[in-house]
Structures are given as structure tokens and as C-alpha cells.
Amino acid sequence: YPNAVGHTQRTPGGDEHEVARLYPLPRSVNAAGAIISTVDDLLTFAQFQLDGGVTRDGQRLLPEETVRAMWQPQIKAANFADSYGIGWELHSWDGVRVIGHGGTTNGFNARLTILPERQYAIAVLTNSGRGSAMHEEVVAADLQARLRLEEPKPQPISLSPEALAALAGVYKRPDGVITLTA
């Protein structure tokens, strides 16, 4: 069977890519993921979630209450979701609940998005270290085209001059430097 080859950026922020070098993941990351999967695997897992913990062949692996509890907000999320459930990023599109989670390793990215009330799921896999941006675009286009849902627009926030001044400074990342002034 042919396999996709992962790609990473040659330089941070650059447009040139190179084949990602495979590296063994230490056992310490197993709890955080370390899962190798396919689109079919992800959609099978999505159906398991939608069916309340029951497998394709009718075997109950989790109580339905447990699956539903995983979808409940546990903590406010930073900038990647509205909140975080038990293993799930929680969002809302046009008032419709959206749960999802992504994963990444050297040169590969994956994202599973489920809309429980619509009995709908989409899985997107890419062989690029920058694939997560593409995932967002593909999921947004799919939900707009198939379910007629509009992507939530970022809401502006107001900060006092004091709060803005507290954020002023120079921030350094591997791909550049950002200078904020108040």
C-alpha cells in the first residue's frame, strides 16, 4: 500500500518544504496520543461517540452517560476552542454544538470534528507540518456547504489602557519577533 510522506518547513515561517524525518516517540507521550490512524478509523471513532459508546457491531464499551459527559465544558479554553471537555475541544457554530480534537507529529496533522445533534462528522488528515490551518479551512468549507452553517466570527474585545500597557513588550518565537506597544 502506498503511504503519504510527511513534510515539514525547511526554515520556520518559510515556504520551502522537505520530507519529514521519522523519529521515535518516547513512551512518555503515549498518554497524550501516540495514535496512528486513518480517516476510516477516525470516522469509526466518531460513530462510536455518536452512538453513545456502542461499536459498529453493537458492543457497548462505554456507558452513554460517560460519552455525553465528555462533551460537557470542564474548563474555559484559551484561543483554540470555546471550552474544553474531557478530551474534546468544544465549539459552537450558528448555535450548533461542535466537538473536535486534532493531533500532530513530525510532518503529519489530523483533525476530527463531530456535530452530535446533526449526526455528522468530518475527518481531515494532511501530510504537512502546517496542516492545521488547512484543516480549519476544509472543515469550515464543509460545514458551510453541507450543513449551511456559518463559521463564527471573532468577537472584538475591549481592554482598558492599563490592561493594554501591561501587554506591551517584545515577544520572541522561533519564526520571528513581535513588538507590542500600547
What role is predicted for each listed range?
Residues Y1-Q9:
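Hydrophobic, small-residue-rich alpha-helical packing segments that form membrane-like cores
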Residues R10-A182:
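Catalytic loop of the DD-peptidase/beta-lactamase superfamily, centered on the K-T-G motif
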